[in-house]
Structure formats: structure tokens, C-alpha cells
């Protein structure tokens, strides 16, 4: 995939390791300090512009590791792939998982990131709807057309 000049592209190695392995690869490609904020978003979220509005609407707390959305259907749940995190907190959580399990390949994001001190923003299910099924795709196509 081509990306604009100045954009860093990262991919887990080997490919297909899951979202947490992708986050790990992305962090490794960045040259940022531990207190810098990193936005993590799922690639199958067509409504990402709206998601960012909720995540960045207010300053983040000094003592928190990040902010995530809480929404979904049929019951709301923490959306760890729709969040903004301190780079150091992400790195620490991933490094601890690697130390315990040898790798984050195939490991669930929730399993590793749920221990972080996160602020949560409650949103409707539509805000964080992703594309997992043909019905999801049809819903987004009707909404974006």
C-alpha cells in the first residue's frame, strides 16, 4: 500500500500477527518519547474521523495512560482499538506481555491493555461500528453515500 510522503508505514513481521503485533511494530517504527501520545485505530473503522473527535475533545489527565471509547452492540464494551495512549504505557504493556509469553503474536489487545489506567468515553454503538460482515459494509455504504 502506498502512503503519502512523510508517513511512516509499519507492518508486523511476519504479517498476520494480529492488532497487538501491529501496534508493537508501529511503536518500534516511531521515534517518540514515553510521554508522547499515540493514536491507535482499527483499520476497519470507516467512521474514524468521528472517533478522533471523541478521543481528542478534551485534554487527557496527567495520571492516565490513555483514553478509549466505550460503545458497541448489543452491550457497550471497551474499544481498545479506538484510543489514544501514552507511548511509554503502550510500550511497557507490550514488553511485559512479551516477557511473560515470548511474543504478542495472536494475543488479544484487551488481554494486554486492560491493565492500563485509561479514561473512557461512552459513545453510541454507531460511533464505533466497524466492518466485520457484509451487513456492516452495507450499513456503512448507506451512511457514507
Model segments located where?
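Nucleotide and nucleotide-moiety/phosphate-recognizing core
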Residues: 1-106, 111-127, 134-138, 144
